[in-house]
Amino acid sequence: VYKRQDELGINSETLLSKTESIVHGTTVATNALLERKGAKTGLLTTLGHRDVLEMREGLKDDRYNMRLPAPAPLVPRFLRLGVRERIKPDGRIHTELDNTSLDEAINKLREEKVTSVAVCYLHAYKEPKHEQETKQILEAKLPGVSVSISSEVFPEIKEYERVSTTIVNLSLI
C-alpha cells in the first residue's frame, strides 16, 4: 500500500478510498493439502462406491510406470462409508434414502471424531434430494461438524471430480 501511494503521489486514505479490492495470495491452502494437515473428513457415498477416490477414473500420474504408487486419498478408506440410496442417471429415484444405513454411518463418523463430512451420492447433480436430506440429518446429529454436499459444491456429471472437489472444499475449512 505504501509503495503504491508513493508511486501515485497520494496519501493512503485517498488510495484506499479509490481501491475496489485488495487481493492477497498465499500457498496456505496448497501447503495444507500437500502436507495433509486438513480437517479430519468423513465421506458418505452411495453404497458400493466408496472407493472412487482410489480408482481415480483409472488415471495415473505416469501411466507407463507400473511401480509408481498413487498418492493416498485425502479420506482414508475407514472414513469412507456407503449409504443405501440410489438416483438413476436421469434423476429419477431408484432407491429411497435408507435412514437406518445413514444412522449407522453417522454413528461411525461420530466415533471417529470427524470434524467434517462430505456427501457425494451417485447422480446427485441431476437430483440432489438425498444429499440435501443427508445434510440436514448430519447437521442435526453431528452439531459443530462441517458438511458439504457435492450437488452444491460441484454439480457436474463426473463422480471422481465431484467427490474430490467436495473433499478438498471441506479439508480446508
Residue map of PLM features:
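N-terminally biased helix-coil "hinge/interface" segments that flank
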Residues: K3-I173
